């Protein structure tokens, strides 16, 4: 099982049989920078995949994506998969055993009773919802993060935006795509728990929270009831509709794909990360690192109280988990790597990006590199960061006169700085709530460089960090696995993953090193002390 599978001759016959018999499962995930798709066979191996780059943009002070670009990307991804099946197996991909859609969690997509989008898609990245976060968290005695969909809706009501009276339905990005493909207004448990608080017993919306919010004046004077405009939560493996005729045309304008294919509940990227890393059991957790970063730990028991640094969300099968989320991670890091690439081009010594990333990352753990990055500090904030108390962000690299500026120290400062914001919430979980974490599993592109990012992450969190062959391609594959779970009866999702999907998967574990852990702690303390630098940059740089 790997994220990028080149099928050998012996597997072609088996894969052909699976394609003909619709024993294949498709997962499509809309990430922050790429839309990716993975088609798996009956043995949970990827037999075709596709990807499409897209970018968020800042419009009228709010981060958004163009939904027409989302559909163009989805169609491109499916076309790549369909063409690969035709090329490799001389078959038309006209039927699939199950489909699942996943996407970035949270955000705000609101529609009127004619299914018209009322305002441009507002993503998880927006931090204009601080007042809503503060009021809702106080009213519910729960942490309602700025990213959550209910915070977006309530902020719109607080701001008296004209569209609020006309809301007939609101959802997340995965919920929207699923709705357009199937006609069903549903959402998987994990993605739902990033919209609005969930009841872990009923596996539905928290009725007490619904009643409290309904009684807030800004909501009580609306012509709608909150419960009526939310999607219906569904557990992993539940039937969530079929591909409609219109949906088939949206997904595959060529007309090859047949309607009627069953769908599983749409999910968020936290859920697909848990599935792709087999971290659904209490005491396990995963770190998903990309444009943003979040660490999710499945809880053995509820936390003692609400913490503003931690989201309480669900696994796709309904277990409570705690999430520390940071809005910023690789944007600044990628910009620095691109600068080195430009230098290589300037001296007419071009280098592949894979080799460049590997070389730069390895320098961060070279023998001559100081464990605390030698007095160099980096703030990777391209946007606001709740964990650090920032409503906006600026990129800042700073060093003391005594700092040793070497390539290794510079790169370690970059990597440490990227992990610092998420560590704020993780420290609350481990040091205040005393949650014991057995291990974390890393996934996302940054973990594609063998062991380096694991070593940095293990220094930040103080626990072993494991990666598997799917480390850099987890989301769409994880959603395809959830799609395949629709065929399984009388087996829990945890057992399905443990005993079938991951029964023979290799992994690499890096254990924390004392010098790294102590070095990161010194860096982290300086990072927190020097945050006024970031505030000054925000105040003085447009």
Where are these regions (language model features)?
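N-terminal glycine/serine-rich phosphate-binding loop of ATP-dependent small-molecule kinases
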Residues: 1-119, 134, 166, 227, ...
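Active-site core segments that coordinate phosphate-bearing ligands/cofactors
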Residues: 7, 12-20, 26-27, 93, ...
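Active-site donor-binding loop signature of nucleotide-sugar glycosyltransferases
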Residues: 52-54, 123, 512
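Gly-rich Lys/Arg/Thr-decorated short loops/hinges at beta-loop-alpha junctions or inter-strand turns
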Residues: 54-64, 136, 189-192, 224-230, ...
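Short beta-strand-loop/turn "lid" adjacent to the catalytic site in phosphate-handling enzymes
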Residues: 85-123, 143-145, 178-199, 230-243
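Carbohydrate-associated surface elements
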Residues: 126
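Gly/Ser-rich phosphate-binding catalytic loop and adjacent alpha/beta segment
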Residues: 129
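A conserved helix-loop-beta module that forms one wall/lid of the active-site cleft
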Residues: 214-234
């Amino acid at each position: 099982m790997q994220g990028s599978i080149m099928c050998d001759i012996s597997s072609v016959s088996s894969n052909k049989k699976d394609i003909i018999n619709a024993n294949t499962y498709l997962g499509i995930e809309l990430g922050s920078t790429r839309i990716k798709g993975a088609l798996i066979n009956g043995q949970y191996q990827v037999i075709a995949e596709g990807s499409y780059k897209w970018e968020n943009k800042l419009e009228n002070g709010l981060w958004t994506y163009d939904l027409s670009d989302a559909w163009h990307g989805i169609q491109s991804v499916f076309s790549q998969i369909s063409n690969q099946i035709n090329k490799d197996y001389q078959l038309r991909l006209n039927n699939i055993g199950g489909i699942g859609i996943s996407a970035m969690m949270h955000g705000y997509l609101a529609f009127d009773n004619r299914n018209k989008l009322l305002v441009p898609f507002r993503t998880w990245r927006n931090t204009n919802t601080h007042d809503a976060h503060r009021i809702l968290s106080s009213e519910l005695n729960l942490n309602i993060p700025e990213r959550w969909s209910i915070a977006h809706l309530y902020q719109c009501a607080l701001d008296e935006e004209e569209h609020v009276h006309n809301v007939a339905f609101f959802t997340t990005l995965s919920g929207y795509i699923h709705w357009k493909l199937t006609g069903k207004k549903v959402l998987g448990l994990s993605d739902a728990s990033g919209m609005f608080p969930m009841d872990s017993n009923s596996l539905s919306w928290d009725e007490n929270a619904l009643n409290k919010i309904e009684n807030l004046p800004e909501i009580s004077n609306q012509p709608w009831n909150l419960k009526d405009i939310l999607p219906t939560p569904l557990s992993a493996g539940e039937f969530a509709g079929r591909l409609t005729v219109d949906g088939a045309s949206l997904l595959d304008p060529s007309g090859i794909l047949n309607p009627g294919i069953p769908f599983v509940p749409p999910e968020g990227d936290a859920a697909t990360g848990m599935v792709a890393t087999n971290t659904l059991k209490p005491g396990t957790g995963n770190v998903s690192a990309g444009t943003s970063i979040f660490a999710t730990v499945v809880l053995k028991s509820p936390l003692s109280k609400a913490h503003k640094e931690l989201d309480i969300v669900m696994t796709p099968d309904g277990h409570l988990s705690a999430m520390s989320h940071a809005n910023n991670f690789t944007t600044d890091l990628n910009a620095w790597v691109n600068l080195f690439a430009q230098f290589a081009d300037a001296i007419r010594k071009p280098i592949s990006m894979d080799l460049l990333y590997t070389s730069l990352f390895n320098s961060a753990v070279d023998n001559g590199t100081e464990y605390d990055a030698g007095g160099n500090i980096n703030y990777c904030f391209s946007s606001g960061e709740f964990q650090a108390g920032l409503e906006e962000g600026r990129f800042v690299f700073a060093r003391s006169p005594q700092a040793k500026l070497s390539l290794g120290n510079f790169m370690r400062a970059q990597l440490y700085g990227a992990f610092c914001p998420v560590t704020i919430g993780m420290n609350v979980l481990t040091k205040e709530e005393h949650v014991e974490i057995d291990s974390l599993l890393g996934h996302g592109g940054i973990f594609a460089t063998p062991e380096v990012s694991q070593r940095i992450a293990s220094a930040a969190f103080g626990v072993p960090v494991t990666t598997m062959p799917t480390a850099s391609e987890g989301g769409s594959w994880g959603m395809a696995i959830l799609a395949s779970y629709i065929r399984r009866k009388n087996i829990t999702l945890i057992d399905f993953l443990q005993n079938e999907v991951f029964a023979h998967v290799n992994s690499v574990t890096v254990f924390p090193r004392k010098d790294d852990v102590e070095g990161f702690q010194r860096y982290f303390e300086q990072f927190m002390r020097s945050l006024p630098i970031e505030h000054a940059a925000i105040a003085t740089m447009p």
